[in-house]
Amino acid sequence: MIKFKFLLWVLAQLLQRKINSNPDCARYVDGKRLTFQIRTAAGAGRYYVVENGKVRSSSGLTDSAQFTLSFVNAHKGFEILSAKDAQPAFLRGVGSKDLVISGNFLEVLWFQGLTEFLQPPKVIDSLDRTAF
């Protein structure tokens, strides 16, 4: 449970750092107003507000979330959110019912686009570089 809660707290810090350091990420969130939450079925979680080019988070849950990611338990939540293969892990979680998404799915897709900024840049091997 502690690792899950820590990961949720760190998520907001990482997103804000990326917004501050990456102009493309800053443009992506510019003008966006979104409230969402990530939680467990037992009720532990955190909610996030994206507004005015900033991300802030608070412990607990909110009634005004535009979407909610609900994990069956903290262990599964940590496993899915910290997976190296993020998108396939997310889809496996939805398929196995370890993750339930409720709310506005367009906002979920927007959020997935935001989390793409957290991925390390793809390194192209010198042998893979071709003119075509």
Segments from the language model and where they lie:
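Feature captures hydrophobic
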Residues: 1-132
